[in-house]
Amino acid sequence: MKALLLDKAGPVSSLYVGDLPVPEPGAGEIRVKVHAVSLNPVDYKLAGRGNENWKWPHVLGLDVAGVVDAVGEGANQWSTGDRVFYHGDLSKAGGFAEYAITTAHTTARIPDGVGFAEAAAIPCAGLTAYEAVVRRLNVQPDHIVWMQGGAGGVGGFAVQMCANIGAAVITTASERNHEYVKSLGASYAIDYANEDVVARIMEITKGRGVDRVLAAVDEATADQGIEVLAFRGGLATVAGLPQLAESTFDNARSVHRIAYGGAHTSSNREAQVDLALMAEEMIALVAEKTIDPMIEQVIGLGDIPAGLAQLETRHVRGKIVAELV
């Protein structure tokens, strides 16, 4: 099979298209004929540092959509021909290939009317946003929420979810993306490059601060998130933990860390099954046209290194998806 290969940890420019044997599913696993994969920042980060459990050459790619091609022993909930998608285990071979292996219990079904590219765009960014907005932050209609990086994958999904709930959404984005994030549901867009973000948020909220923050950029913006949280506010972070001062706890603020890699590496089956449950809930929203998967670019397998290099600039709007079929 054709696959995008990495011979050793290094820059995305070292990725190349090569040949590998078609893998066979083990007990509790299925083989998927890959139709589409989406690109995520975690892909270039993993390429750069590697993983002690990888076998070389390694195949990256965590967000996969395709058709069940073979079923391993005990994976009887799936049949060949089923349309599926999943968020993969970063310690194992991924989906930047014509065929991929995944665990049956972490896999979700693609409903009629949803394409493979749309499904592939969901897992990493969509599940992160869902976990933060719905599970951890419990965003309510009367909340004011700061969703950082609203033009990106995680931020874009989160902006839409909060707007659908009825919350007022403030987001940060470059000026060229202001109309875009407002089209997703943001009430206010702040130019992080040319405005004092903290001062602008406090102006918008009349000094009160926001009820919820999703820190999706870096540790510095996570620190800003703590700074603008109102009394009993909550922050969820995927970008590193903020510095926590005593005042954080004096104001009864809470901090939540989102990390999906742990669901696989912890051997916590309940958490792994939950990946599939959340994926089913997310793709139902896409099927209902309640959530837009925000596909901005569709590329081929050989274009993935260039796509990942784009992601490294942190100036990509929405999602990049590679179609293999």
For each feature predicted by the language model, list its residue ranges:
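C-terminal substrate-binding/catalytic core of Rossmann-like NAD(P)-dependent dehydrogenases/reductases
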Residues: S247-Q297
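Glycine-rich beta-strand-centered segment in the early N-terminal region that forms part
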Residues: P21-S38, G48-S91
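NAD(P)H dinucleotide-binding glycine-rich loop of Rossmann-like/cofactor-binding domains
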Residues: Q77, H87-G149
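Short glycine/proline-centered loop/turn elements that form peptide/ligand docking sites
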Residues: G48, E73-G74, T171-Y180, E219-T221
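C-terminal capping/lid region of NAD(P)-dependent oxidoreductase domains
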Residues: I283, A287-Q297, P305-V325
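Glycine-rich cofactor phosphate-binding loops and adjacent beta1-alpha1 units
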Residues: A189-I258
